[in-house]
Every structure is written in C-alpha cells, then in structure tokens.
Amino acid sequence: MDRPLYPFTAVVGQERAKQALLCLAVEPRIGGVLLCGEKGTAKSTLVRALGGLEGVRLLELPVSATEDMLLGGVELEAAVRTGCRTFQPGLLARADGAVLYADEVNLLPSALTAALLDTLETGVCRVERDGISHTCPARFALVGTMNPEEGTLRPQLLDRFGLYVAVTGER
C-alpha cells in the first residue's frame, strides 16, 4: 500500500478486533474477518495497519471498483500498440496469497459481490470477456468493514467471514 500506515500497536483499545486480525495474519484460512461498527471506531485504521506487519500483503477493494478492476480484462494500451489482446490481471488475481480488504463491504454492487463469492468459493478467478478467456489462482483472506447504519450485508457474503467482531467506540 502506498499510504502512510498508522502502526497497529498505536491503536488504543479495540482488543477483540486486533486479536481477530492477528489471527488472520497467522492463519489466513480462518475464513476472513468482518469488523462491524459505527464510523470513527478505528476499523479501517486497524485493517490498513495490518498491511504494515511483516509478511502481510494487503490490497484494497474500493467500493467504487468496476468489474474490470476486480476481475481483469484486456490490456488496452497493449491492444492499441500491438493489435493483440493480452490479459491484464484484476484485483482478485493480484490478491492471490494476500489479504483483500473491502471497506464498506455491505455497499458493494451485486455483480462484484457475486464475482467475489465465486472466487472465494473456488480459489480461482475466471475471466471470459472481450475475446479473452483466462483463469488464474486467487486464494486470499478477506477482511471487510462495515457500518450497520449504512445497510445490511448480504447473507451469502456474511457466511464467508469466519470471524465477526462488533466494534464499539471506546468510552
């Protein structure tokens, strides 16, 4: 990640959220982590700080992502330059072996949620579009954050998280 990281250990409180994220860092196969809480409870800060820990590679899935960004597609520059269609990997393929962070996961569009669920289930990203058919490994740990005031999470996506932590404001 290219943004400055707030150190994981510098976040005061939120011990259950920290413990869940550290469990994921140690054993990515636990099934992912969902942090749910109101705005300003350090959910995103903690997840981004996880990427600063040794051995953890973190990629972010923006809520504004498109299918091309998520799955990949034709590398337009190469297609224009050479006339050949070459595959440009999307975020899911690049997340292989990493932690994929979806902020406001409950706000992801249905098409992205379906692609994410399929890839989580199979561990493979399949792309068939624009005259390209491509398959690549995509085994990653999913971390999501959400504010319940902004909507619920689809049940089929909720089932993909092994750990759920309700994050509250420290008093």
Please give the residue ranges for each predicted region.
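Conserved Walker
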Residues: 11, 30, 34-38, 80-91, ...
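Conserved AAA+/SF3 P-loop NTPase catalytic/coupling segment centered on the Walker-B
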Residues: 46, 66-69, 93-120, 152-160
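Conserved AAA+ ATPase "SRH/arginine-finger" region at the nucleotide-binding site
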Residues: 59-62, 164-171
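Pre-Walker A (pre-P-loop) alpha-helix and adjacent loop at the N terminus of AAA/AAA+ ATPase modules
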Residues: 3-39
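Walker A/P-loop
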Residues: 25-63
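AAA+/P-loop NTPase substrate/partner-engagement loops
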Residues: 53-79
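Conserved alpha-helical scaffold flanking the Walker A/P-loop in AAA+ ATPase domains
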Residues: 22-25, 79-100
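Short glycine-/polar-rich loops that comprise or flank the Walker A/P-loop
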Residues: 30-31, 54-56, 96-97, 122-124, ...
